[in-house]
Amino acid sequence: FLFNEFDNIYVSFSGGKDSGVLLNLCIQYIREHNLDRKIGVYHMDYEAQYQMTTEYVEQTFRENQDILEIYHVCVPFKVVTCASMFQTYWRPWDESMHAHWVRPMPKNCYKKEDFPFYNEEMWDYTFQTSFASWYHKKHDAVRTCCLVGIRTQESLDRWRTIHGNNRLNSYHNLMWTRRLGYDLYNAYPIYD
């Protein structure tokens, strides 16, 4: 359904279980149906993440680079933190803190300079929404869909995304879709 309705599709891939299953289902679908297209993959690299997550993301990219258009994003957007009594946010890949980075910045990643919409006051989820619009325009797409795998039990906002009764902003009244902008949608085809 989604590959017929949207000419431009990308997966928001954290490296976790839900987004990993979703991305692998898309990869499998593209390969089994011999689709002559690539699928975008958006990975927000938070710098301080589990080593096995980083290894899984890198392996997935490496093994499927023939059909993936990879956006490995290493940008110093603001991220909420509860690990400090002195800071309300932190910034992954903050150049002013380079000496304290948890690990080296990955090669071939996208940096703040690659995104004309980026500004220093931007939070991670604001960046994500702006990325969707930028990606849609970059591809001169008719209709763009970002595929997201979520755990609805993790927060009330996530649960409402799927089970809420706001259908005005859905695609063809499908409860697992949300309109982000003109011809720009998020879809949550798998959720638990």
Where are these regions (language model features)?
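ATP-dependent adenylation/nucleotidyltransferase module used to activate substrates
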Residues: 1-191
